[in-house]
């Protein structure tokens, strides 16, 4: 967990303690957020490219949601 930022560690603790809801389809959740980020013109092009690249890599991986 040390390699992740403080905000991620905080949310992890909240989910683990039951204070924040757990999402069973974690990959679907990640892809949804990455898609929203990649499409958000308010974000920098660099951030949008990182989100698009990460999402594309997940889609090429074994993840299939049908």
Curated annotation (Swiss-Prot):
User: Which Pfam families does the entry mention?
Assistant: UPF0253
Tree of life domain: Bacteria
Name the InterPro entries on file: UPF0253 (IPR009624)
Q: Which HAMAP family match?
A: UPF0253
Family, as annotated: Belongs to the UPF0253 family.
Under what name is this protein listed? UPF0253 protein YaeP
């Amino acid at each position: 967990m040390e390699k992740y930022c403080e905000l991620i560690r905080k949310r992890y603790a909240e989910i683990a303690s039951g204070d924040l809801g757990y999402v069973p389809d974690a990959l679907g959740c990640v892809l949804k957020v990455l898609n929203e980020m990649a499409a958000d013109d308010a974000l920098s092009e660099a951030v949008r490219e990182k989100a698009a690249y990460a999402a594309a890599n997940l889609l090429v991986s074994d993840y299939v949601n049908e």
